[in-house]
Regions:
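C-terminal, surface-exposed recognition/capping segments
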Residues: 3-4, 14, 24-159
Length: 159
């Protein structure tokens, strides 16, 4: 779940409250961490499984697009890691990589960034933003399978 280096388990959850803090490995490639996916879990502050603290929520797809319209660039830190600079450095997103849903392994740490959005697109997928050092284009993707461990960026919920 929310702990970056948590141990793994091979059993998908029956409910949105998994009852443990283990990363659920989706060995059957259902593309979700739940047996019965729920597209409304992260909707705003009052979402059942909102990964953000009280009073905060994830960006919507529309909000991610608005941020990217301010201009962005993939840059390198002095330590050699990559990050996305939006609006001339007003927002920095580290290339934190992701946790592979099918193996539980970490991938692309320091070279690619993967951030969740609040919008469910279809069964097992949600909006997300992806960027990497090799491809200057940064995009909003509809192929964010919810079983993968991606970073979150929480924003104050003014709704």
């Amino acid at each position: 779940h929310e702990k970056r280096y948590s141990d793994t388990i091979l059993t998908l959850s029956d409910t949105y409250e998994a009852g443990h803090s283990l990363f659920i490995v989706d060995e059957k490639k259902a593309n979700d961490w739940m047996l019965h996916p729920d597209d409304d879990l992260w909707r705003g502050e009052k979402g059942l499984s909102n990964p953000c603290p009280c009073g905060y929520r994830l960006h919507t797809e529309k909000e991610w697009r608005a941020l990217l319209s301010l201009g962005y660039e993939v840059k390198t830190s002095p330590e050699g890691f990559y990050y996305l600079s939006i609006a001339d450095g007003q927002l920095l997103l580290p290339a934190a990589g992701l946790r592979n849903a099918y193996t539980g392994n970490f991938q692309h740490i320091g070279t690619r960034g993967y951030y969740w959005g609040a919008n469910a697109i279809s069964r097992g997928t949600s909006a997300c933003i992806d960027f990497n050092k090799d491809d200057i284009t940064t995009n909003i993707s509809i192929f964010g399978f919810r079983a993968f461990g991606r970073s979150v960026r929480c924003v104050k919920d003014n709704q």
